[in-house]
């Protein structure tokens, strides 16, 4: 089988990176970019590469690519400073596992994400269901406690846990999108 020349291989890897990025899989896109840069350090669209690396929270690689982009476009010193200042304030990634652990206490995982109203609602809703179940169990109405509290609590409690994780993903996506938008607006 004939081997592909390095230049064509780099182009193919960049196309795969773009396809993965458009499909929402930035980690795979970054892997293809790493492979392309290993073959040819000057290959590809540096702006797109920077945005992909930023989405993976690999800000050092993103800054390296954007500096290379600025060099090739002949940017002035002010743009370099603006980009460097932006990269000094990179967004912090919130951890899904932290939100899940914190949501053991209903609502706290929501508070971690800044969703105060949702957290208070989750805490109140779970509290009402637990109180109802405890009152039914105290009155020795166990079937009523299980049906009236146990089953709904399964949905409200587990739903709160999964919602806390969803909020982390939404928040991370929003913060990195805002960061990339600021970067593009500087160029």
Q: What kind of feature is each model-predicted range?
A:
Residues 7-14, 18, 25, 46, ...:
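Hydrophobic alpha-helical membrane segments
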């Amino acid at each position: 089988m004939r081997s592909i020349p390095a230049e064509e291989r780099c182009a193919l890897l960049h196309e795969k990176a773009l396809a993965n990025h458009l499909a929402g899989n930035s980690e795979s896109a970054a892997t293809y970019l790493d492979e392309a840069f290993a073959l040819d350090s000057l290959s590809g669209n540096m702006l797109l590469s920077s945005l992909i690396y930023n989405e993976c929270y690999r800000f050092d690689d993103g800054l390296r690519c954007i500096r290379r982009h600025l060099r090739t476009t002949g940017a002035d010193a002010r743009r370099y400073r603006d980009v460097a200042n932006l990269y000094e304030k990179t967004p912090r990634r919130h951890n899904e596992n932290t939100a899940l652990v914190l949501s053991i206490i209903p609502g706290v995982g929501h508070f971690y994400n800044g969703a105060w109203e949702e957290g208070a609602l989750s805490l109140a809703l779970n509290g009402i269901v637990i109180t109802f179940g405890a009152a039914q169990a105290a009155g020795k109405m166990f079937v009523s406690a299980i049906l009236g509290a146990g089953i709904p609590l399964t949905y409200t409690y587990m739903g709160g846990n999964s919602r806390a994780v969803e909020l982390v993903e939404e928040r991370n996506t929003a913060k990195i999108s805002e960061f990339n938008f600021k970067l593009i607006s500087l160029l």
